[in-house]
From Swiss-Prot:
Residues in the signal sequence: 1-24
Listed GO MF terms: neuropeptide hormone activity
Protein name, UniProt field: Crustacean hyperglycemic hormones 1
Disulfide bond sites: 53-89, 69-85, 72-98
Tissues expressing this chain: Produced by the medulla terminalis X-organ in the eyestalks and transported to the sinus gland where they are stored and released.
Native organism taxonomy: Eukaryota, Metazoa, Ecdysozoa, Arthropoda, Crustacea
Organism name: Penaeus japonicus
Amino acid sequence: MIAFRAVWSALLASLLLLLLAPSASPVDAFSPPEASLTGGQSLSKRSLFDPSCTGVFDRQLLRRLGRVCDDCFNVFREPNVATECRSNCYNNPVFRQCMAYVVPAHLHNEHREAVQMVGK
């Protein structure tokens, strides 16, 4: 009976760990870091973002611009808004419309400058 309770407690503890860490898979925990989905190829920082953004790589600016698109998508709930807003490195009419809708007017110039910096 004591062995059953120990096994049961271990099972519940492992299930609790799985529920608390859904993003980590058991395979990732035991595989070496170089064994990734890319077949061992390293990803550059820029590959995580739109390749059309050839200007200054600034995570903060990219996050700020991406947040405009995310907020716009959350308002309109149109699937094409999320992708079109980010196209051409945020230099497009959809991004400008989203900016007009979700960004206060006094911050528009700041966002326009950010688009110019990351998209050069």
